[in-house]
Amino acid sequence: LMAQPIVKAQILLYGSFLATGKGHGTQIAIVAGLLGMKTDDCRIPDSFRLAGEAGMEISFGEAELKDAHPNSAQLILTGADGRQLEIVGESIGGSRINIASIDGLSANFSGDYPTLIVHNLDQPGHVAEVTSMLSHKSVNIATMQLYRAGRGGHAVMVIECDQEVPK
């Protein structure tokens, strides 16, 4: 999610996730996902221990979301460099998720592909600059979505690619 180790994760559960989280393994699954584990990883039951060994501080609480999917979680993540990312994810069944918001802006993507998230100002040329950089690195874009708070304000590009994006 952050292209760097996550050192702190505040995980806020909502709806049925909040009601059944511990009993259904929701907390374990979310922590495993933050560690980058695939859904068939045999280490998932040990995700809390592995997160501790990786230096990840984890806390759980209750999310206050409006009009959210009943199986939602709000994640407030802090990376090793101090940058924060806030996302709301929805469990849509079959071990699949949908990201419904990024840093307070509505979104709608799965994360099934290597995903680049770019924060920028909503100004002409930013999209062209990013897509040009990807082209020069021979990275093909599978999907691209743009979200903004308002004209000229904070914006986010969500770019799902066919391969990992080189640094």
Predicted regions: what is each one?
Residues M2-Q10, G15-G25:
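N-terminal glycine-rich anion-binding loops that anchor highly charged ligand groups
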Residues K22, A29-M37, C42-D46, F60-A63, ...:
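A conserved regulatory-domain signal marking ACT and ACT-like small-molecule sensing domains
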Residues L13, S59-F60:
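General beta-strand structural signal in soluble alpha/beta enzymes
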Residues L1-M2, V127:
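Alpha-helical support elements that line or immediately flank enzyme active sites
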Residues P70:
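C-terminal binding/interaction regions
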Residues A73-L77:
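Short beta-strand scaffold segments in enzyme catalytic cores
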Residues L65-D67:
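Short, catalytically relevant binding-site loops at active-site mouths
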Residues M2-Q4, G52-E57, S135-I141:
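Short secondary-structure junctions
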